[in-house]
Structure formats: structure tokens, C-alpha cells
Amino acid sequence: MSNSLQVLITKFHNYIKYEKQYSDHTIKNYLIDLTQFRNNFNTEDITTITTTNLQDYISSLHTMGLDSSTIARKKSSISSLFNFFCKKKIIDKNPCKKL
């Protein structure tokens, strides 16, 4: 299976839409959050993303002046994505666990 972040986000989208049956509104927000997240990294290989990378990303959201509830939602989106990666055995350890 490819570790391309975009390919895996598409698989995650299908998972939350068809298996988890999230609302269209939730799916839309997750995809916006995850697209912004993907655009922040210079890698397409998700196995190289560390807890430190995620902490830096969250810190940058604070620096941008985003509302705390918006940041919490973005963290939730990212955490759900990495939980999916673990569930599907794409990664061994979830870097979100220590956020």
C-alpha cells in the first residue's frame, strides 16, 4: 500500500463516509483540515511524521491566531486520521498519542 498522504486521506475519506457514516458537514470539515495539514508537510510519506512535527504544526495554528475550538477540531481530525492509519496497520505507532 502506498504511503502517499493524499492517497491515504482519500482512503480515510471513504472510511468516514461509508463505514463510520459521518455527516457531510463533518466530512467536509475533516477534509479541509487534513488538506491544510498535508499542505504543511514537505513529505508524502506519513511514516516520517513525528509527534514533534505534529506539535510544531499545532503551535503554528496558535501563532496564526486561530480560535482554540478550531485548533481542537483540527487536532481531532488529525488524530482520527492517524488512528485510522494504526487500525489499518499503515503505521505502527500513533504520533498523536502524545499531543
Task: Locate predicted features.
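N-terminal core-binding DNA-recognition domain of tyrosine recombinases/integrases
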Residues: 10-25, 31-99
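A detector for short, charged/polar N-terminal pre-domain segments
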Residues: 1-7
